[in-house]
């Protein structure tokens, strides 16, 4: 497949042109024109790049790319090494960030809802869906379910709450700031990737169950879903590689 054609296909599938993002979505570094083998992962870290090189990959697709609005516009240190490795091996680097968070089927949030069997009822923000469990469950049972499904013991806070979990809002990745919008929707639980100090106070004072399942763990299933879609739809030689991250 042509490298620019692959970019167009995924841009169309994820409706990338609809969003203003903090990164350039699509092809971030141009490599060889013809792509036969692709490696995918959550983040364009050196470990993933090295594995792509050792696997003779022509392309890398990630959720977290190399270029961000808030990053210095200077290429040095680890970023120089990453970019040099990609260019020296004529590899195409693609990244889809927000579009892969919010896609209604392949997106990270959609995947979380599907995995936890949450019936989506609406959206508090475009990246913050809310929904209902079929039956209320205890917080310890939700923790066990998350551990089983995401292979990660979640951080949980809800020491002052006696009611069970039923109505949940969630946001993949670094979504803890969105807890501020939760109370007015009558949600009893908020789940996201990361946690901040002030998150605990807000959850406590609003009597909310709070779960942090890990940034990486909350965003692993979107890129896996995109990988599977490309493999089935276009018969590509494409494989996901998990570079585990405890955060």
UniProtKB/Swiss-Prot annotation:
GO CC annotation: cytoplasm
Residues annotated for a divalent metal cation 1 binding in this entry: 63, 101, 219
Pfam families assigned: DUF34_NIF3
MF (Gene Ontology): metal ion binding
Binding site for a divalent metal cation 2: 64, 215, 219
Keywords, comma-separated and alphabetical: Metal-binding
Disulfide bonds: none
Top-rank taxon, per record: Bacteria
Subunit structure: Homohexamer.
Entry similarity comment: Belongs to the GTP cyclohydrolase I type 2/NIF3 family.
Protein name (database record): GTP cyclohydrolase 1 type 2 homolog
Annotated organism of origin: Buchnera aphidicola subsp. Baizongia pistaciae (strain Bp)
